[in-house]
Amino acid sequence: MIRMTLKDYDFLSDSTEQTTTRFVTFITPGLKRFDLAIMSTNRFYGKKLVTDMMFGRSAVLGPDDLEEEGVLESVFRINEEEAAELAQFLTLVLGAVHFTD
């Protein structure tokens, strides 16, 4: 096996920043359990990184994504009813998207 060092990699981006992460577990009215980590960062134009910790699926989401048909179903592999309930929760926590120049 070839031993590689950091100089062998061509980094396109490499940065460190302070983030805020909210960990929340809840059960929807339809009895679907969600264990989420919702990370706020200076990246992603104000959108948040939402991770389903039970299944290891994540997406960068903002309020506009919640209005797009099929986004939550596709990313988190859930049905339409579960997606509607998740969207109702995420609407409360995602906040507005902030675009910069």
Task: Please provide the spans of the model-predicted regions.
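Negatively charged, low-complexity tracts enriched in Asp/Glu with abundant Ser/Thr
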Residues: M1-D35
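A short, structured beta-strand/loop element
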Residues: I38-D64
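Mixed-charge, Lys/Arg-enriched low-complexity segments
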Residues: P63-D101
